[in-house]
């Protein structure tokens, strides 16, 4: 709330609504909380249509919506930084990542000022309502995993048990490598995932199974509830699901932005749509 207030004071304007910066995890709920506390609407949309590893990796970047001016604060809001201008969105990413490293990996921000016209065209639409439907399925469906795959038009990539889990925090990121031994239909196979905060690439038996920007998610094999990369541990029984990325990310400009991030993350494989990589459908 303080970050938004500081940004409003700098601009001399009031916010009419809040949009989550990305979908999934704490960042979505933080936006809901701010909107509720301020008594203003939250838009049924977000800036990525998925969780992303870097601040500038938003569809707004594709639409040339500047990241700055931006306000960043630590978890207690005792330290508040106003960033009036940056060279580009990637420069802003480096600044906020440095702050995250100093502030125990947590930074609250208010950024990306959109006009009413931009709100209608730039964010990925209907993502909050989709999340609510998925939450309902997790609570009520007899087979939550299959229900989620059907709702998201996703793919079941693998089922198995975590044999190895490596986590390392450096430069403001949590790097994760997982190796799974197969179960059920995958009992004779192995699976490997790599993450930079978010899962970026997956291989089954050494062959590419999924790659960002398509969404790769690990979930509890029985309940369908998400197990985020940094929390997965050896012995966990997981299902790995893949979901096609929002259309903006699959266009040339979106893929080019992701390619830069992947190369910085040590991943050199070219993008291939998940539906071409697997024939194992949602049901």
Predicted segments with their positions:
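Glycine-rich oxoanion-binding loops at beta->alpha junctions
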Residues: 1-16
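A short, small-residue-rich loop immediately preceding and capping a beta-strand
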Residues: 14-22, 41-43
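Flexible, glycine/charged-enriched surface loops at secondary-structure junctions
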Residues: 15, 103-115, 144-158, 247-253
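Short glycine/serine/threonine-rich phosphate/pyrophosphate-binding segments
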Residues: 21-32, 49-54
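Short, acidic/small-residue loops that bind anionic groups at enzyme active sites
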Residues: 37-56
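A structural-propensity feature for long, helix-poor, extended segments
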Residues: 57-99
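Oxyanion-binding "anion nests"
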Residues: 132-183
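C-terminal non-catalytic interaction/assembly regions of soluble proteins
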Residues: 166-283
């Amino acid at each position: 709330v303080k970050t938004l207030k500081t940004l409003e004071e700098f601009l001399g304007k009031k916010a009419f609504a809040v949009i989550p910066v990305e979908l999934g995890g704490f960042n979505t709920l933080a936006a809901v909380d701010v909107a509720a506390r301020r008594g203003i609407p939250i838009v049924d949309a977000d800036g990525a249509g998925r969780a992303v590893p870097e601040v500038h990796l938003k569809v707004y970047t594709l639409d040339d919506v500047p990241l700055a001016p931006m306000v960043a604060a630590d978890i207690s809001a005792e330290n508040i930084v106003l960033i009036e201008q940056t060279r580009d969105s990637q420069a802003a990413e480096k600044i906020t990542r440095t702050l995250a490293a100093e502030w125990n990996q947590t930074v609250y921000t208010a950024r990306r000022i959109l006009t009413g016209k931009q709100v209608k065209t730039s964010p990925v639409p209907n993502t909050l309502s989709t999340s609510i439907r998925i939450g309902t399925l997790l609570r009520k469906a007899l087979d939550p995993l299959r229900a989620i795959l059907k709702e998201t038009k996703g793919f079941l990539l693998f089922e198995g048990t975590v044999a190895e889990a490596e986590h390392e925090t450096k430069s403001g990121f949590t790097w994760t490598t997982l190796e799974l031994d197969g179960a059920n239909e995958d009992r004779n196979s192995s699976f490997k995932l790599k993450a930079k905060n978010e899962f970026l690439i997956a291989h089954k038996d050494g062959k590419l199974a999924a790659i960002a920007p398509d969404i790769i998610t690990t979930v509890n094999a029985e309940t369908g509830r998400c197990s985020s990369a940094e929390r997965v541990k050896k012995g966990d029984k997981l299902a790995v699901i893949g979901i096609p990325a929002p259309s903006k990310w699959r266009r040339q400009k979106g893929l080019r932005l992701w390619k830069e991030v992947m190369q910085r993350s040590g991943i050199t494989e070219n993008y291939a749509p998940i539906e071409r990589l697997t024939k194992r459908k949602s049901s």
